[in-house]
Every structure is written in C-alpha cells, then in structure tokens.
C-alpha cells in the first residue's frame, strides 16, 4: 500500500492521488489539517514539502518514496517497462532499482 500525507489544497497532493487512482494502485491518504500537524510531519518524516509519500514494505515498515515528482517518475518508468499494468509490486521493484544503489 502507498501512504500519502497530503494537504487538501495542494495541487501536487491532488496530482499524486489522481495518479494512484488512475492506475488502480492501493493507497491511503492521511490529510494534514493543521499547521501543527504539518510541522510535526515535516519534522517526523524529514521532508519539507507535501505530499509525503511512503510505500508499505511489510506489516510494520514503510519506505520513503518522496514527493509527487518521485511518484510520477517511478510510475512512468513502470509503464515504460511493463506497459499499462502498474502494480504495487512493480513500483516497489522499480524504486529499489532506481534509488537503492
């Protein structure tokens, strides 16, 4: 599952959510409602922008994907390699090959 920390009025957050919906990728949006929450997640996740996107790799562990541009890049690479069938497994595989070196 992809987990996103999002702001309701953020166009990048909306783009990331739309991309996941269009590709039928299982995800959960956590809406950040207050400035206090925003500052907490920025500090906790060590990211200054939104959306903050993570991939669940097992029951208790999540891997940071990054922001909207990172998600778009990974999905586009998956599509170029695997065609229109983008799955959570293919995103994980591409992420590992693109960023874990």
Residue spans of the language-model regions?
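Local sequence-structure signature of Cys/Sec-based thiol-disulfide redox active-site neighborhoods
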Residues: 1-28
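Residues that form ligand- and interface-recognition hot spots within folded domains
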Residues: 8, 31, 69
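N-terminal beta-loop-helix "entrance" segment that forms/cooperates
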Residues: 37-44
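Non-catalytic, surface beta->alpha helical segment in thiol-disulfide oxidoreductase systems
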Residues: 55-95, 99
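Structural micro-motif
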Residues: 44-55, 68
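Short intrinsically disordered terminal tails
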Residues: 1, 100-101
